[in-house]
């Protein structure tokens, strides 16, 4: 199990559970700061992050209908290899959204981050722990 400290958001001054996550697609890799969001249904990948990984928007065909603040935003489902710290890489499914990272951050939600990892939040201590699922 790996322990993380909340990161203070510059705009709001509020602690947020952020992790550095390495994403891989083929030979291309990218490390993103992702919000571990137990209230999010899906993992979200901003447009520019997908483009950096070599994804081509026009080649996608698995349409995702989004709700909430992303309702009406065009999105496609993509599967990427992801690695958190020293843990073994796993496959995560993302809704790749047509919004840049300046408008939406990478989110790790119920499908399927919380199916691959056990997450424990200790909000009063501004700490959270993550461990790969037991096999």
What are these regions (language model features)?
Residues 1-135:
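Pepsin/retropepsin-fold aspartyl endopeptidases
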């Amino acid at each position: 199990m790996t322990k993380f400290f909340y990161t203070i958001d510059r705009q709001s001054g509020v602690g947020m559970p952020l992790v550095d996550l390495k994403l891989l697609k083929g030979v291309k890799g990218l490390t993103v700061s992702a919000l571990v969001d137990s209230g999010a249904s899906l993992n979200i990948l901003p447009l520019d992050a997908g483009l950096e990984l070599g994804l081509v928007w026009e080649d996608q065909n698995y349409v995702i209908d989004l709700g909430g603040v992303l309702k009406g935003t065009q999105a496609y489902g993509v599967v990427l290899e992801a690695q958190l710290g020293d843990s073994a890489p796993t496959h995560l499914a993302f809704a790749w959204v047509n919004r840049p990272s300046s408008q939406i951050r990478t989110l790790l939600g119920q499908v399927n981050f919380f199916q691959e990892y056990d997450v424990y939040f200790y909000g009063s201590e501004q700490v959270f722990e993550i461990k790969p699922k037991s096999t």
